[in-house]
Amino acid sequence: MSFSRRPKVTKSDIVNQISLNIKNSNEKLEKKYIRLVVDAFFEELKNSLCLNNVIEFRSFGTFELRKRKGRQNARNPQTGEYVNVDDHHVAYFRPGKDLKDGVWGIKG
């Protein structure tokens, strides 16, 4: 499976798709309000992670922070320079059952 040319979905694409889904349900909501909700959602996700909260969407997946140990003599791939990396946290996503099942049979 080649991952170099996968289609990319942007936040604008998500806003447009939500807008289409709402129009198909015969409701009206302007894109600017949908964008506000999507922006607020991602901001809340980020803020919750920064507070070291675990964010769980049942059957979809869980976002959490994981601690990475620091290393000595890590190499900067752009410059080749050796640097020390302190302990730090990274965002981690663990997919839920429905998401795993949904993507299991995708052929690439």
From Swiss-Prot:
Q: Which UniProt keywords apply?
A: DNA condensation, DNA-binding
Q: Which InterPro entries would you find in this protein's record?
A: Hist_DNA-bd (IPR000119), Histone-like_DNA-bd_CS (IPR020816), IHF-like_DNA-bd_dom_sf (IPR010992)
Which biological process, per GO, is one annotated for this protein?
A: chromosome condensation
**Which domain of life, per UniProt?**
Bacteria
- Molecular functions per Gene Ontology: DNA binding; structural constituent of chromatin
KW Transmembrane helix (keyword) present: no
Record PROSITE patterns = HISTONE_LIKE
Pfam families linked to this entry: Bac_DNA_binding
Q: A Gene Ontology CC term for this entry?
A: cytosol
**Annotated function:** Histone-like DNA-binding protein which is capable of wrapping DNA to stabilize it, and thus to prevent its denaturation under extreme environmental conditions.
Family note: Belongs to the bacterial histone-like protein family.
Protein name from the UniProt record:
DNA-binding protein HBbu
Q: Which organism is it from?
A: Borrelia parkeri
What gene is it encoded by?
hbb
